[in-house]
Amino acid sequence: MEGTLLRRYGGFYYVESEGRVWTCRLRGRFRLQETVFLPGDRVEIKPVGPGEGVIEDLKPRRTCLKRPAVANVEQVIIVFALREPPPDLELLDRLLFLSGVEDIEAVIVWNKADISKQEYAGLPELYRQIGYRNLITSAHTGQGIDELKALLAGRLSTFAGPSGVGKSSLLNAIQPGLNLRTGEVSSKGGRGRHTTRQAELIRLPDGGWVADTPGFSRLDLPAITREEVAAYFPEMEPLRGRCRYASCLHRKEPGCAVVAAVEAGLIIKHRYEHYLTFLAEVIARERSFS
């Protein structure tokens, strides 16, 4: 019978199938092949005892995120705080970029709205104008929680973002009694303390799954070509084909429509700077393999 892998603990795999959770082990061939199973994987299991089973097969994945490591995700809920820790916009743009490459819908959730700093108040509108879906929340006051519940219902979602922004607090607000560990922001450097150790799927009361995942601070870009980078910046898409040179990479080439848009204030400066950062990383990797 088919089920969904919730989590792994040691050599045991916990799979939900037919309304119950089965404690499973892997078939020997998977151990020999060193197959990596991820939360969200659809698997075929064979019962071998009361509540116990063996994983017989791994179904093809529709999507696969490396970090957070979750399979078959339908949307990524990217959580940042409007106060502490200060929004790392390069990390935000990197997460949006990766979601685009993986063809997974991204939603930006701006948490801690009840204690937001004025200097960050304009960020949701900036990203809305680019074309990203935004939601403003407060796990403390309940602002935006009903909208977030509706967004998650019936879908497999993952929460991503740095530690300390309130991912676990939001999940606790969505499903009271979940009692996920929550972290405070460290006074040293304003970084959040990690409170989630490994990814696991959580069944939501209105249907659907959410992956509670570890915090992180660095993500490598996927294996794409330098020509593809701009395609994952939505604000650059309308300018495709308008540069003087077809091979333009938008790095100060003569007649570059993207550079002109940046200078005219039509493209946000930090977004363009992050495009150049990602482009440089992709080019460096291409050269390392040439």
From Swiss-Prot:
<keyword id="KW-0963">Cytoplasm</keyword>
<feature type="binding site">
    <location>
        <begin position="111"/>
        <end position="114"/>
    </location>
    <ligand>
        <name>GTP</name>
    </ligand>
</feature>
<feature type="binding site">
    <location>
        <position position="250"/>
    </location>
    <ligand>
        <name>Zn(2+)</name>
    </ligand>
</feature>
<dbReference type="Pfam" id="PF03193">
    <property type="entry name" value="RsgA_GTPase"/>
</dbReference>
<keyword id="KW-0862">Zinc</keyword>
<feature type="binding site">
    <location>
        <position position="256"/>
    </location>
    <ligand>
        <name>Zn(2+)</name>
    </ligand>
</feature>
<dbReference type="InterPro" id="IPR012340">
    <property type="entry name" value="NA-bd_OB-fold"/>
</dbReference>
<keyword id="KW-0547">Nucleotide-binding</keyword>
<feature type="binding site">
    <location>
        <begin position="161"/>
        <end position="169"/>
    </location>
    <ligand>
        <name>GTP</name>
    </ligand>
</feature>
<feature type="binding site">
    <location>
        <position position="243"/>
    </location>
    <ligand>
        <name>Zn(2+)</name>
    </ligand>
</feature>
<keyword id="KW-0699">rRNA-binding</keyword>
<keyword id="KW-0479">Metal-binding</keyword>
<dbReference type="InterPro" id="IPR010914">
    <property type="entry name" value="RsgA_GTPase_dom"/>
</dbReference>
<dbReference type="GO" id="GO:0042274">
    <property type="term" value="P:ribosomal small subunit biogenesis"/>
</dbReference>
<protein>
    <recommendedName>
        <fullName>Small ribosomal subunit biogenesis GTPase RsgA</fullName>
        <ecNumber>3.6.1.-</ecNumber>
    </recommendedName>
</protein>
<comment type="similarity">
    <text>Belongs to the TRAFAC class YlqF/YawG GTPase family. RsgA subfamily.</text>
</comment>
<feature type="binding site">
    <location>
        <position position="248"/>
    </location>
    <ligand>
        <name>Zn(2+)</name>
    </ligand>
</feature>
<comment type="function">
    <text>One of several proteins that assist in the late maturation steps of the functional core of the 30S ribosomal subunit. Helps release RbfA from mature subunits. May play a role in the assembly of ribosomal proteins into the subunit. Circularly permuted GTPase that catalyzes slow GTP hydrolysis, GTPase activity is stimulated by the 30S ribosomal subunit.</text>
</comment>
<feature type="domain" description="CP-type G">
    <location>
        <begin position="62"/>
        <end position="219"/>
    </location>
</feature>
<keyword id="KW-0690">Ribosome biogenesis</keyword>
<dbReference type="InterPro" id="IPR031944">
    <property type="entry name" value="RsgA_N"/>
</dbReference>
<dbReference type="InterPro" id="IPR027417">
    <property type="entry name" value="P-loop_NTPase"/>
</dbReference>
<dbReference type="InterPro" id="IPR004881">
    <property type="entry name" value="Ribosome_biogen_GTPase_RsgA"/>
</dbReference>
<comment type="subunit">
    <text>Monomer. Associates with 30S ribosomal subunit, binds 16S rRNA.</text>
</comment>
<dbReference type="GO" id="GO:0005525">
    <property type="term" value="F:GTP binding"/>
</dbReference>
<dbReference type="GO" id="GO:0046872">
    <property type="term" value="F:metal ion binding"/>
</dbReference>
<keyword id="KW-0342">GTP-binding</keyword>
<dbReference type="GO" id="GO:0005737">
    <property type="term" value="C:cytoplasm"/>
</dbReference>
<keyword id="KW-0694">RNA-binding</keyword>
<dbReference type="Pfam" id="PF16745">
    <property type="entry name" value="RsgA_N"/>
</dbReference>
<dbReference type="InterPro" id="IPR030378">
    <property type="entry name" value="G_CP_dom"/>
</dbReference>
<keyword id="KW-0378">Hydrolase</keyword>
<dbReference type="GO" id="GO:0003924">
    <property type="term" value="F:GTPase activity"/>
</dbReference>
<dbReference type="GO" id="GO:0019843">
    <property type="term" value="F:rRNA binding"/>
</dbReference>
